[in-house]
């Protein structure tokens, strides 16, 4: 089959991604005779579209899957999508809003129907995009976290945890989004520094007494001046929450206030008194050293309140208005309107001492951008530190303890290992997990209430009624309206996708999975919870290795986000996009539409011509090249261009091989002799160069095997690039041209055999990283190599993955080739030094010290003539007397036989020597300047030293040439 003149990825990708799936090549088996390799796709939001982070981790996962599939493993890469409670509900609510309808107008049942309709229409968008990336999961196992099998598992797990006393309902402080009207997880809260204010407010002593407050100190820190006060000053960034204050805390070691601990204060604007308490939480150096304690509206205050048994007074409604627990003057006001009124009233009463600008971290909802409120609400929680009861896999240990043990004892390995510390730190400081959400879309909590509020947790309503009847209640039951946190169902994925609670063949074969590929930002939210739930319900760990990768940032190191307008869609990198379409994508749906103009400006500046189409393989190779363990990635589009060129290079190399091999005897007769086994003049006669490329191939195969074992895709990509581009294309193909043009028939057969065998092996080696181009090329190359059709199917992805054979490493051939390379480089350098036109072919003379060396040098002659563009190559006992420069390689001397205008050459060399002298003097002057060396970055100083060394080496060569003239 003739290859097209240039590599056009679009048609190849469209054909093969359909063909592979249609032929069933992705489908996993549970063959007991094969080792298992399984991997879970972190389920993307069903609402979502791909971003570069998906492109990155799916390149890694697919590379691992294809590699193990080719090595004969039962490979199960299990795909799925997440119902994404909040995200999905928001999308559908926005659609209704455009029709001037709210979800409350529809009612819960109709609204949920609408969400399912939307999911069925658009839920395949992201899986279609995953296919575009060349991903090869077993689509027959695709799941949705709210499909029937997963819902059944979620209910079963919830009921069992309640029965075991590990899920409870209670009133605790949670992150509350007042726009969405629900609790949200920490991951859905974005805290960024903003400009705010600090208000200093006077809280009067309730008994009207006064005390001496130090206002001046000597050098030793002793007070020297005091003033009489009948109040203390509290500093706060949220004056509206003072309506819920229940105490003021001071540092127990703070001598300014020690004597006041236990006294009562009058809470301004409220007819209440609150105590002064001592607590280590207070930093006496910050603000005034007095902290208002509002347990119902601050997480730290909540902890202080628990320690001191303080009341919790909630002063906000669920939509963030002042409620009935506050003075009537503020009831019904929005929290920020209340803030203004409270500050004005404090000022009017002479209680506002100071207002000053203050930078503070403000928590906002990632989807609504509203300020998140710590809110005291009734929620369901998983007990993270409570010992599990008898009858569970690890009785007497909490699910957190077990999760820590499984990493500590090595059953789960974290890569890089430093993430183990982060994992441990999070789990050692864990709080009970709030798992309820006040949404309509999600797994509705399987709990029913009787008329007196007693709860019955059950697998279905009939079971709940039976439990109520057994408890002596026969009235109506009302189901809990809350749904479960999306992370709850996600935490069950390792076993909910394998048939649990039944011990199915899948469950036995693929749990634990081999590796989890994930970003560090969800180690706690997802990874740790999967460990907890899987160990608790199956006794097994969910995975053996956790490969933690960094975040993908833009080329300047900025985090990619919609609000910054710097996100990149991997499909746009595959297909290309013009600048107008790119601007439109980046500016639609912004939370702050005012950002659109600046985003458009920066986008047009960075991509004036839009983004070129690079194809999937180039994008995947780029991702692999970035995949060093753990580091954040500054994504540079120019790398995609470089790796598109790499794909073109591989395509063109294959065309060259096919043009030189098709229709010829390529050395593949029955039972041909292996490389190196045939005598000269036999059927095949392998050269040193043939042996060299085969030897280098073995080393590359070994390096790549190590890269896969260590999850170092950056090393895999580097090994592939270096061998394919540098060794095979730049050197061996050029050598092969010489052998085909000048060799005997046996040498030509050996060359063609080597060209094809090495190329076919290259394609199999590179397939896990660049699947499309390797499949397309393999289909044309394999038939020429004597390939026998595979009963399982004729695809590269079903071929065995290459393994290094130590017996084929040939150090003698490697040394020979290293010498040829050095001589070629020497000739090219001589041409450069003499400023010869690339088109000018000149003779080369090489001096040999003895007949053995002469024979060896003669073996290089035909190659040097072609590689260095020489008219002829001669070996002599001694070089002729000539002003021409000489290069020494080992013990051999090389000279280009060229007539030289001595006067002109002396003048040229004089000018160049003077220039280099000047550069060295200038650089040494910098390095001799103590101020420069002290202030300049170490890298700049090192570069300057390197310049001096390079200039000096060149200068010495030029002076030698000048002396000869």
Swiss-Prot record:
A motif ('KMSKS' region) lies at residues 559-563. Keywords: Aminoacyl-tRNA synthetase, ATP-binding, Coiled coil, Cytoplasm, Ligase, Nucleotide-binding, Protein biosynthesis. Its main location: cytoplasm. ValRS has two distinct active sites: one for aminoacylation and one for editing. The misactivated threonine is translocated from the active site to the editing site. The C-terminal coiled-coil domain is crucial for aminoacylation activity. It is an enzyme of class 6 (ligase). This is Valine--tRNA ligase. It catalyses: tRNA(Val) + L-valine + ATP = L-valyl-tRNA(Val) + AMP + diphosphate. SUPFAM superfamilies: Anticodon-binding domain of a subclass of class I aminoacyl-tRNA synthetases (SSF47323), Nucleotidylyl transferase (SSF52374), tRNA-binding arm (SSF46589), ValRS/IleRS/LeuRS editing domain (SSF50677). InterPro entries: aa-tRNA-synth_I_CS, aa-tRNA-synth_Ia, Anticodon_Ia_Val, M/V/L/I-tRNA-synth_anticd-bd, Rossmann-like_a/b/a_fold, tRNA-bd_arm, tRNAsynth_Ia_anticodon-bd, Val-tRNA_synth_C_sf. Its EC number is 6.1.1.9. The lineage of its organism: Bacteria, Pseudomonadati, Pseudomonadota, Betaproteobacteria, Burkholderiales. The gene is valS. It holds the Pfam family Val_tRNA-synt_C. It is found in: Cytoplasm. It comes from Janthinobacterium sp. (strain Marseille). Residues 803-835, 900-965 form a coiled coil. GO terms for cellular component: cytosol.
